[in-house]
Amino acid sequence: MASLFTLAALRARYAARPEAVRDVVDEVLARVDASSDPAIFISRVEDGALQSAARDLLARAPDPESLPLWGVPYAVKDNIDVAGMETTAACPAYAYRPAADATVVERLKAAGALLVGKTNLDQFATGLNGTRSPYGAPRSVFNAEYVSGGSSSGSAVAVAAGLVAFSLGTDTAGSGRVPAAFNNIVGIKPTPGRVSAAGVVPACRSLDSVNVFAASLADGVFVRRLIEGFDARDPYSVEPELRGLRAQPRVGVLAAKDREFYGDGDCAALYAQAVARGASLGWEMVEFDYAPFLAIASLLYEGPWLAERLAAIEPFLDAQPDALDPTVRGLIESAREFSAADAFRGQYRLKALLREADAVAKKFDFLLLPTAPTIHKVEAMRADPVRLNAQFGRYTNFVNFCAMAAIAVPSGFRGDGLPFGVTLIAPGHCDDALAPFAAAFHEASGCGAGAGKEKVALAPETADDGRIEIVVVGAHLTGQPLNRELTDGGGFLVEATRTAGDYRLFVLPDTTPSKPGLIREPGFAGPGLEVEVWSLPAESFGRFVNAIPAPLGVGKVTLANGRAATGFLCESHSLQGAREITALGGWRRYLDRERGVRHAGQ
């Protein structure tokens, strides 16, 4: 089995020998030709054209470090436009040849990535299973009798099978998450609007989101950051915002009454294990009422939002109804029974449900849900295409209605070896803040990536787009009085960690709010102190540092892993007679002790 392509491995190869890009292209072509699944791609860049693209890249940008995705092979779902290649949306009669790239493809090409081909999908992105295509049904890389998940079926399988380093799909109801779960990879669904959908065949235009599949959070987040950003071509495009989450998150999990797995005892047990894994990571796991979210989810295929799918292709459907997959046609044509009045009633119902769901969601930093409650064989899905497909969307359909960010990660394996995944779902624009938690969960699962369960670099890198990290130790920690100075300035939490062992912590006298003073004493053997690393835009960092009052200042703080980052330090002369709290291990422990809160071991 071919090993997965990762950004780190490709960068290392290219740094040693830039001409290796031609070898990588040859490897990609050989892997595609040797693939046992003929339904992954609908169309491919011709072999000679892909080899020529590698030569052109070497000629125009000979330094691999000059472009962020230099020489990285990727694929896109075939409802995303690529200039000069047909867009079919898995419907041959609908096919057209666009003159311009979709915005996301344009950005990937500018970053130096090499397109391998366009992947299969449930026709018109209507389905979560991957069988609704005249080009065949891609299969789970773990067992060819089982569905790959959809609608972004080929995109997920292409990554999991090691044919490309990453791929793009689209996600309206869960199409960028369910296939990730069924193939043991990562699926990143951004906050709606963060990534442009210009040049994408719409399913439900008001809900559609372009997603990224990758072997790891490190790779997926890197790609997402490159393709996101406001685009005037897309009326639903928004400027990405930066919102943080607490270092010790409160996580919503399904109550026992809401844990529906349709008789799949293995998946039920794996979800219980996932909840326990979250607790082992230090997360506070709290059950919540899923009812309003389930009611929102049902609107997508049982309410007037079906009419939005009709609006996307109605002239074509009217002209060539027999060109559609029978199941897809039946679903979309059923929208004709809804009236304009029904559409407004649906909006009113959605608003009421969103109010209920928001009241629940605001109690948590993020939710941890099964990505899909079970998996089915291809033949079973074809025999019962609507009911079984609906099962896959039980825990995914609501997310875009709620304008939330979601990351699907591997979480375990059933007794028969098929993968199970979970999805972390956070408020909109917490995309970057959510990623470290998803990476930590993925790593703790031990599932690796793809059919080979390969161990890959999991943690996302901190964005390097003019942002600066700052280590905070006291009143700026998550949940503390001055934390808003970070979040209001566009800051997001990178990680919660500890300092090296040679730091000491004191309570500064006469400060409001109360603040600690951190100093380094070489040779001191301490426990290391709890800190948080935050990322700030450069302009916010300057204002933030300028406002720091004496005796505090900034300098390099060495973390427990040996990395040094800019952080709060204190002038030592101000600590004469100050109370030392180093033994407590951190500022929060000191505050808890002052309030009479006891911790294990105390």
Predicted stretch roles:
Residues 68-91, 248-254, 304-358, 410-419:
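Short helix-loop capping/hinge segments that flank enzyme active sites or metal/cofactor-binding pockets
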Residues 1-55, 450-452, 456:
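An N-terminal boundary/leader segment
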Residues 101-102, 106-224, 400-423:
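Short glycine/serine-rich loop segments
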Residues 9-15, 29-30, 120, 246, ...:
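Serine-dependent amide/ester hydrolase catalytic core
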Residues 439-440, 444, 449-601:
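Glycine-aromatic micro-motifs
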Residues 50-52, 60-133:
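Acidic/His- and Gly-rich active-site-bordering loop/insert found
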Residues 20-26, 55, 265-289, 313-319, ...:
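Acyltransferase
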Residues 189-269, 273, 292, 355, ...:
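A short helix-breaking turn/cap at a secondary-structure junction
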